[in-house]
A protein has these predicted regions:
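Residues within well-ordered alpha-helices
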Residues: 12-13, 115, 147
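Glycine-rich, phosphate-binding/catalytic loops in enzymes
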Residues: 1, 75-79, 122, 145
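A Rossmann-like FAD-binding core segment of flavoenzymes
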Residues: 25-46, 53, 121-193
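Rossmann-like NAD(P)H-binding beta-loop-alpha module
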Residues: 90-139
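Glycine-rich phosphate-binding loop and adjoining beta1-alpha1-beta2 segment
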Residues: 1-10
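Short, conserved glycine- and acidic-residue-centered signature motifs
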Residues: 81-84, 112, 140, 144
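FAD-binding core/adjacent interface of flavoenzyme oxidoreductases
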Residues: 9-103, 175-192
Length: 193
């Protein structure tokens, strides 16, 4: 269990400099690249100031964004993705403020299963919806059966071989429409890749 937010950070700009002599600029956005002159224009997101950096070699590594399927209701403020620490804090704040009683986790990979277990440990009634016939895709079905037993022992329900068709938002929560059935819930966590 993680008790301090700082325990989630593996590296800091200072530790990158100390260990690897790499100058990491957080809260900075590359807004232009001049390949002819080998420069990058950078905007400091805190001050708005722009400056130019020269480079010998340039590696583009913009990161990834969570997948948000194109389904009705996906933009509800009760629908969350988990990709980084700010996402984690947003989910935590929602739970503390709104006191949801139930959650649907869409996606049964490592992150989805871990999130489902944490939500269940926090007292929520949790269902995992997974398109495949088993959790944790790299596992074969027989190995995944042990994971299924463990998850069910935690009180987590499984909707395997099922997918989300639409989300309907209301003052009382969300209705998750599946290929087969519906689930009423207070929040949805997307963990589909």
């Amino acid at each position: 269990e993680i008790t301090e937010k700082s325990n989630l950070t593996l590296q800091t700009p200072e530790s990158f400099m100390a260990r690897f002599n790499i100058d990491v600029r957080i809260f900075s956005e590359a807004i232009a690249i001049d390949t002819k002159n080998k420069t990058v224009t950078v905007r400091d997101l805190k001050t708005g100031e722009e400056y130019t950096e020269e480079y010998d070699s340039l590696v583009l590594s913009p990161g990834a964004s969570p997948i948000r399927p194109r389904i009705d209701g996906i933009d509800s403020d009760k629908v969350f993705t988990l990709r980084n620490i700010p996402d984690t804090m947003k989910i935590k704040q929602y739970i503390e403020k709104s006191r949801p009683r139930s959650a649907v986790v869409v996606g049964g990979g490592y992150i989805g299963v871990e999130m489902a277990e944490n939500l269940a440990n926090a007292g929520l009634d949790v269902t995992i919806v997974e398109l495949s016939d088993h959790l944790i895709a790299p596992l074969d079905f027989d190995m995944a059966a042990d994971v299924h037993r463990y998850i069910k022992s935690k009180g987590i329900k499984l909707a395997l071989g099922n997918g989300v068709v639409a989300l309907k938002d209301s003052d009382n929560g969300l209705t998750v429409e599946l290929n087969r059935g519906i689930i009423d819930t207070d929040m949805v966590l997307l963990s589909v890749g």
